[in-house]
């Protein structure tokens, strides 16, 4: 089918740039020829043309990929641009490949959340057995570190709860006698009570000089 026929079919089906961005990729010609790509008819002409969905938008940042690649070569080594882009695409495909297999397991077990065990299962099922054991150790260390952070947060909450919220009669001590002068010029004696200092565990007292 020629280009004009493709354009007509796309318009009749209501295929717009939003549909294309949902997972269908378009290669746009360098000279911007409208007949070489899918269009949405007069609607796009009135509202302005939309940029086609780029495959680069679903890839990991190429700077991050290049940084990881450089850790495996000598400091004086260089990596060509096409090599970076090739690895960038391979990594993205690998992630989709593993995630799809893990998602299939969740679907069979009627679960909605993919966890670490699902990823390990997918790696083993797809033949990446050499990755399973190192990733299992990493997953265990990661979960232990998360438990440690929760323990620190619990300690902070416990220390905060140790601060008294109510002042009882025993907490007042050392009444100080003083006097004030009222508006009519008469002197009136009053008693001022101060609170006793309580040492709170884990809190250093403030020294005034």
Swiss-Prot record:
The keyword Nucleotide-binding does not apply. Residues 31-52 are annotated as: Disordered. Coiled coil: none annotated. Residues 144-209 are annotated as: C domain. Residues 41-52 have a biased composition (Basic and acidic residues). Keywords: Activator, DNA-binding, Nucleus, Transcription, Transcription regulation. It comes from the Eukaryota. The keyword DNA-binding applies. Residues 87-98 are annotated as: Subunit association domain (SAD). Component of the sequence-specific heterotrimeric transcription factor (NF-Y) which specifically recognizes a 5'-CCAAT-3' box motif found in the promoters of its target genes. NF-Y can function as both an activator and a repressor, depending on its interacting cofactors. Can be divided into 3 domains: the weakly conserved A domain, the highly conserved B domain thought to be involved in subunit interaction and DNA binding, and the Glu-rich C domain. This is Nuclear transcription factor Y subunit beta. It comes from Petromyzon marinus. The gene is NFYB.
């Amino acid at each position: 089918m020629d280009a004009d026929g493709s354009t007509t079919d796309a318009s009749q089906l209501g295929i717009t740039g939003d549909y294309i961005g949902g997972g269908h990729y378009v290669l746009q010609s360098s000279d911007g020829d409208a007949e070489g790509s899918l269009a949405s008819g007069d609607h796009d002409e009135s509202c302005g043309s939309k940029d086609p969905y780029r495959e680069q938008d679903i890839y990991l940042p190429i700077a991050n990929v290049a940084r990881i690649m450089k850790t495996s070569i000598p400091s004086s080594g260089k990596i060509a641009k096409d090599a970076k882009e090739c690895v960038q695409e391979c990594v993205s495909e690998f992630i989709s490949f593993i995630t799809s297999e893990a998602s299939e397991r969740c679907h069979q077990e009627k679960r909605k959340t993919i966890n670490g065990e699902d990823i390990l299962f997918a790696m083993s099922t797809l033949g990446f057995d050499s990755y399973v054991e190192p990733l299992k150790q990493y997953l265990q260390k990661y979960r232990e570190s998360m438990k440690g952070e929760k323990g620190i947060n619990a300690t902070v909450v416990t220390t905060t709860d140790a601060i008294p919220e109510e002042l009882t009669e025993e907490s007042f001590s050392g009444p100080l006698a003083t006097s004030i002068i009222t508006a009519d010029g008469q002197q009136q004696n009053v008693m001022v009570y101060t609170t006793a200092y309580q040492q709170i565990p884990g809190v250093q007292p403030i020294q005034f000089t």
